[in-house]
């Protein structure tokens, strides 16, 4: 997850060959098979019709409230993103193999919900877009960073990040409680949020959305909170 004090997006230089792995603020490193995660990735993040890839949609979590980890404040809210140069930053620190696979699957102009997590009122607060596809995450090499990985080498990096840019605030805050209410109802009726990853893989801080899920959540902006 990005932090205001970090270098500007793209500062790590040109993209290198495909890497492997990354973390999000709320995730810990997991011992997992990359092969298994790649299989999961194919099933959950690439939507195809007649052999053509459709747009991908995402939900990306970040912590809006201060929390120190190894002396560094992990806070990064949507307001912090708005305050960045060109309202753009690198989404670094992902250290979970499945989340890393999701980051690698992201394409330019993919849309993502900015989700405030690990706070008093978790939920969706805004929209952003992917403006640079996966490239090496510089924090894996920085010894003083909470996400330093001594097993990762600059000539063979393990973890990746993407660059994101603020698009807009949501017209209203969409809370976790509201989403959960719809999820539970849709499990019974077959509605759009019946299988939403936010509730089936809660700890993942980078999550895929189907277009149906994305469109339904956008439609909630115009509705009264449930």
Curated annotation (Swiss-Prot):
Composition skew (Polar residues), residue ranges: 29-38
Compositionally biased spans, kind Basic and acidic residues: 14-28
Keywords linked to the UniProt accession: Nucleus, Phosphoprotein
Cellular component, GO, one term: nucleus
Span of the annotated motif Nuclear localization signal: 5-10
Intracellular or extracellular location(s): Nucleus
Entries under Gene3D superfamilies matching the protein: ph1033 like domains
Region (Disordered): 1-38
Post-translational modification note: Phosphorylated.
Function: Specifically binds 5-hydroxymethylcytosine (5hmC), suggesting that it acts as a specific reader of 5hmC.
Name used for this protein in its record: Thymocyte nuclear protein 1
Species the sequence originates in: Rattus norvegicus (Rat)
Upper lineage: Eukaryota, Metazoa, Chordata, Craniata, Vertebrata
């Amino acid at each position: 997850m990005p932090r205001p004090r970090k270098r500007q997006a793209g500062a790590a230089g040109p993209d290198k060959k495909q890497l492997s792995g990354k973390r999000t603020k709320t995730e810990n490193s997991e011992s997992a098979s990359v092969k298994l995660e790649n299989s999961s990735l194919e099933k959950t993040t690439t939507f195809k019709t007649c052999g053509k890839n459709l747009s991908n949609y995402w939900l990306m979590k970040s912590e809006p409230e201060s929390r120190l980890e190894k002396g560094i404040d992990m806070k990064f809210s949507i307001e912090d993103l708005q305050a960045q140069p060109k309202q753009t930053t690198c989404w670094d620190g992902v250290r979970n193999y499945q989340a890393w696979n999701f980051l690698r699957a992201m394409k330019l102009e993919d849309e993502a919900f900015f989700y405030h997590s690990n706070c008093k009122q978790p939920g969706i607060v805004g929209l952003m877009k992917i403006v640079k596809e996966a490239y090496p995450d510089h924090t894996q090499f920085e010894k003083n960073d909470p996400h330093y990985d001594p097993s990762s080498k600059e000539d063979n990096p393990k973890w990746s990040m993407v660059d994101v840019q603020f698009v807009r605030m949501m017209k209203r805050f969409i809370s976790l409680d509201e989403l959960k209410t719809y999820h539970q109802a849709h499990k019974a009726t077959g509605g759009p949020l019946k299988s939403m990853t936010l509730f089936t893989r809660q700890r993942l801080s980078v999550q895929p959305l189907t277009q149906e899920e994305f469109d339904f959540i956008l439609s909630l902006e115009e509705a009264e909170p449930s």
